[in-house]
């Protein structure tokens, strides 16, 4: 692990940055308790900064954190069912020799930190199935709250946790106490964050991000409709709809392949040229406090505007946003994972300030050509989904219940339930990209390999 890290840092002396990075660093620098993105990761960066502002130390902490959590997950999986050497070796290799994790650890984003927390979260749920206890439940509550502070994708985690707790082998009293504790903790966090968002961003709401995401998704679908009838919108939406209409009219003569909003990404959310931006052309949006406050101020309106467009064109929304995003869930684009520093040779001032760089210039020893590997991870995700679906079908056809351990059966069902809920949430919430799918990849590979190993053993035994 250490040799792998040292070699990588020789090739990439500086971390990888993208737009999200600078918002996290601004939250870190100001010690904010609310911002456009959740601030849990910023608290980790600030904690590391208490010891040193070295970017290498931060990257190493992220890398080490993942490996510790992955080890916990690995040994938890081994407790679920006996497995062959090849199965253990394959799962171990995917967990600890996966280049995606190495490169993602070098990003100043919450991704690898959230994956680490998620590995502990789901491992605890597996343990609750076959070895429930009050201390484990208490630890799980803390991990669940931690996940909630780091990524909004954790909104589905309480649903999964409560479902498992309902069916785990503890007393009814303990179950009720745990469920009430989860609801209380999460509600308290939402209430606190809502208040802090009002203080920091000027508008009281849990997440300014959600309203913008709703509008972005709706406008993306609206923009890709071949014919857009002229509609009279409510007066509250008149100004923003006029900007959207004028902008979309300007794209009429641009071939789809060259349109800035062609890929299903976050163009309408973050691009300075987006007609949704309060001030078009604003620079460094993610670290522009005044602009972010303006974005937060219109977020409630944009939430309603997005819902209005969806209600006006529900079938078109399904066709031009939901359906493409469903396909993107199975075949996620590499996005920032195949690019270093968004293609730039410099970083924003907040990164230079926090990491105490002498200049804003960054460089790599590598020619970065190997990063194109992540373009093929999309095909790998398709393969994993097909494999996972295949082992599930085989499990049903050959009566998997008869030859699998009870703990494994429960964990397998729980993982499937998680994946179904995650699929629904992800497709509806925002455009899916590769870094959001790495945790799912780990789960898919792990359970597929374990089941294939069981099937092979059963075949040998006749």
Regions found by a protein language model. Give the residues of each.
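Transmembrane-helix motifs of polytopic, lipid-linked glycan transferases
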Residues: 60-82, 116, 120, 124
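Membrane-interface transmembrane helices that cradle and orient dolichyl/undecaprenyl
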Residues: 121-136
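Short acidic/glycine- and proline-prone juxtamembrane loop motifs at membrane-interface regions
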Residues: 103-114
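Membrane-proximal stem/loop segments at transmembrane-domain junctions that anchor or position
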Residues: 206-354
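Loop-to-helix entry region of an early transmembrane alpha helix in multi-pass inner-membrane enzymes
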Residues: 39-43, 51-71, 104
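Membrane-interface anchor segments at the N-terminal boundary of transmembrane helices
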Residues: 56-64, 291-292, 299-303, 308-312, ...
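Membrane-interface alpha helices of multi-pass inner-membrane proteins
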Residues: 137-151, 185-193
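Extracytoplasmic catalytic/substrate-binding loops of multi-pass membrane glycan-assembly enzymes
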Residues: 10-24, 32-48, 52-56, 206, ...
């Amino acid at each position: 692990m250490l040799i792998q890290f040292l070699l990588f840092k020789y090739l990439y002396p500086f971390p990888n940055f993208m737009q999200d990075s600078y918002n996290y660093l601004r939250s870190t620098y100001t010690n904010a308790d609310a911002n456009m993105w959740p601030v849990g990761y910023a608290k980790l960066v600030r904690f590391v900064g208490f010891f040193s502002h070295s970017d290498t130390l931060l990257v190493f902490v992220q890398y080490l954190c993942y490996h510790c959590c992955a080890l916990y997950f690995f040994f938890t999986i081994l407790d679920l069912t006996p497995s062959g050497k090849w199965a253990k070796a394959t799962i171990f290799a995917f967990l600890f020799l996966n280049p995606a994790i190495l490169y993602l650890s070098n990003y100043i984003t919450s991704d690898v930190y959230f994956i680490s927390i998620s590995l502990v979260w789901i491992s605890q749920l597996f343990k609750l199935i076959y070895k429930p206890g009050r201390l484990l439940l208490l630890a799980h509550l803390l991990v669940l709250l931690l996940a909630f502070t780091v990524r909004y994708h954790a909104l589905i985690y309480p649903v999964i946790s409560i479902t498992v707790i309902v069916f785990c082998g503890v007393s009814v009293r303990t179950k009720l106490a745990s469920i009430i504790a989860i609801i209380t903790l999460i509600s308290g966090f939402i209430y606190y964050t809502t208040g802090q968002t009002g203080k920091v961003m000027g508008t009281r709401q849990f997440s300014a991000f959600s309203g913008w995401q709703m509008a972005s998704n709706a406008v993306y679908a609206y923009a890709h409709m071949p014919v857009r009838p002229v509609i009279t919108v409510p007066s509250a939406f008149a100004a923003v709809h006029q900007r959207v209409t004028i902008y979309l009219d300007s794209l009429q003569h641009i071939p789809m392949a060259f349109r800035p909003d062609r890929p299903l990404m976050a163009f309408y959310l973050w691009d300075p040229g987006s007609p949704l931006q309060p001030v078009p052309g604003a620079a460094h949006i993610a670290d522009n406090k005044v602009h972010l406050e303006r974005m937060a101020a219109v977020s409630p309106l944009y939430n309603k505007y997005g819902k209005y467009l969806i209600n006006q064109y529900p079938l078109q929304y399904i066709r031009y946003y939901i359906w493409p995003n469903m396909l993107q869930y199975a075949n996620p684009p590499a996005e920032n994972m195949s690019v270093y520093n968004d293609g730039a040779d410099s970083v924003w001032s907040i990164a230079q300030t926090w990491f105490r760089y002498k200049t804003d210039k960054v460089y790599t020893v590598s020619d970065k050509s190997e990063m194109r590997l992540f373009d093929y991870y999309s095909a790998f995700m398709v393969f994993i989904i097909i494999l996972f679906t295949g082992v599930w079908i085989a499990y049903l056809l050959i009566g998997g219940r008869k030859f699998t351990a009870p703990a494994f059966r429960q964990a397998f069902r729980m993982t499937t339930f998680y994946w179904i809920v995650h699929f629904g949430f992800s497709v509806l919430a925002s455009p899916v990209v590769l870094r959001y799918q790495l945790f799912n990849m780990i789960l898919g590979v792990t359970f597929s390999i374990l089941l294939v190993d069981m099937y092979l053993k059963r075949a040998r035994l006749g």
